[in-house]
């Protein structure tokens, strides 16, 4: 009987060790299953608040901001927080992009090593105040259209998991003055569809496909 008891003890110990080894993975799985997917709606115009704490550069020492702006939460700060949650990738498909705060957030993600890709409209990227030139100067990949229609999308995809979309152009005018809406949705199917659209446009706007004399080409 002693050998049998010894074998039972060994099996029990091995089972316990296996259970302890797999417990963290099981707990993570249960947490993911129980966690509610993100569903958030933001309305604009946004209250003007200080966003310096969110946009602090990597390695910067935390310090209180002396500005006179309110330091509470706003629609803009919540949008910034959703963007800055990116750890791996950020796809942006934007008609107009001139907000300095949102531009700083995108550059900050690039500095952190997040892969950022931007698709925008060729006419609006050339306007005064556009952030597109600064993004390109920082080394961020940007592509634009070359046709008569507008690239009028307004969406972002964070880590291929979270979709941010709505009526909002990423401009100070829209953020502070216009009545706009933004949806922040964690939904696999919606993200997949928008990501497919982004990849389709990204490939269509590949600069190697461009004609530098489109008017002459059409005249032929």
Swiss-Prot record:
Enzyme Commission (EC) number: 3.1.4.-
Gene Ontology terms, MF aspect: cardiolipin hydrolase activity; protein homodimerization activity; RNA endonuclease activity, producing 5'-phosphomonoesters; zinc ion binding
Notes on how activity is controlled: Single stranded DNA (ssDNA) hydrolase activity does not depend upon, but is stimulated by the presence of Ca(2+) and Mn(2+). MIGA1 and MIGA2 increase PLD6 self-association affinity and affects the homodimer conformation facilitating its phospholipase activity over the nuclease activity. MYC induces its expression and stimulates its phospholipase activity.
Chain ranges of the PLD phosphodiesterase domain: 147-174
Localization in the cell: Mitochondrion outer membrane; Nucleus membrane; Cell membrane; Golgi apparatus
Gene Ontology cellular-component terms listed: Golgi apparatus; mitochondrial outer membrane; mitochondrion; nuclear membrane; plasma membrane
PANTHER family found in the cross-reference section: CARDIOLIPIN HYDROLASE, MITOCHONDRIAL CARDIOLIPIN HYDROLASE
Protein name: Mitochondrial cardiolipin hydrolase
Organism: Bos taurus
């Amino acid at each position: 009987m002693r050998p049998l008891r010894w074998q039972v003890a060994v099996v029990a110990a091995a089972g316990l060790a296996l259970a302890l080894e797999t417990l963290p993975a099981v707990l993570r799985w249960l947490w993911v299953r129980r966690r509610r997917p993100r569903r958030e709606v933001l309305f604009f115009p946004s209250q003007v608040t200080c966003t310096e704490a969110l946009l602090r550069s990597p390695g910067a020492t935390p310090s209180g901001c002396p500005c006179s702006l309110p330091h509470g939460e706003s629609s803009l700060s919540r949008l910034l927080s959703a963007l800055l949650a990116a750890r791996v990738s950020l796809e942006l498909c934007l008609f107009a992009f001139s907000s300095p705060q949102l531009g700083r957030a995108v550059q900050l993600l690039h500095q952190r090593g997040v892969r950022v890709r931007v698709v925008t409209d060729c006419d609006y990227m050339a306007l005064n105040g556009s952030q597109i030139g600064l993004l390109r100067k920082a080394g961020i990949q940007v592509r634009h259209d070359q046709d008569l229609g507008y690239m009028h999308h307004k969406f972002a995809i964070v880590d291929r998991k979270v979709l941010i979309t709505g009526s909002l152009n990423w401009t100070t005018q829209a953020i502070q003055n216009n009545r706009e809406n933004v949806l922040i949705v964690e939904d696999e199917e919606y993200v997949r569809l928008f990501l497919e659209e982004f990849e389709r446009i990204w490939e269509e706007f590949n600069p190697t496909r461009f004609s530098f004399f489109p008017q002459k080409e059409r005249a032929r």
